[in-house]
């Protein structure tokens, strides 16, 4: 590894969430929740990522990252304070860029104010406009009804504070017929609250028949919808990414909520899951890659910063 090589890491901070999206793969069993890193170890992980593994882009995800520890917002803001010393906007080579992946329901204005200067991009998940469709997915119920109206208010507040805005959507049979209306909706406010990037995922099967039966989508149908979306967005300034199952499988190296990296590789025709030691036990990214037995070129394709 060249000492100048910098990397991006996706950190699933918690399996917990305030919503219950049916396609989500998070494990909320008592043992999984109990294994979440304590506050001090989260800070330790940040230091190791920055100093030892030369990570310069960190995506904070979940579950819902604003719900780490099962506590709304408080512990997440403590982590933000721990990240702040690694922000060096005057020196792009050493600046730790932060992306927050969230459903945005906990992103009140006072929370957003505390993210200024630390978080660079806020990525919001949005899968449909239709309230019934969102309810079927698990995004529009109880105290979180009116999901789309809340989303619109949130992005106005996010844009006002100068954050870059990105969207994530998962393409499934449940929302398949609603997606073009969603795209038209987003394009309608592009002049006032510009979305810079939008990523569309193919639902990833996890060998869970109860979920796969509902959410699995044929490769050809996924490709057809991606083509329709690309056509509709032609001429806009939104950078589109379409991530199918193969691309997701190839790029799947994540930092877990219990402080270890997980990755997958092929062995004798089987997909094998590998789990590292605690992240702070590694002195370099090369050491971590060897331990996980990942294809170094493939890893660098998705995780080395250009």
Segments (PLM) and residue ranges:
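Generic alpha-helical secondary-structure signal
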Residues: 44-48, 225, 291
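Conserved glycine-rich "GG(E/T)P / GGGxP" loop and the immediately following alpha-helix
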Residues: 26-200
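Canonical Radical SAM [4Fe-4S] cluster-binding loop centered on the CxxxCxxC motif
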Residues: 1-42
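Residue-level recognition of short loop/turn positions
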Residues: 20, 62, 102, 257-258
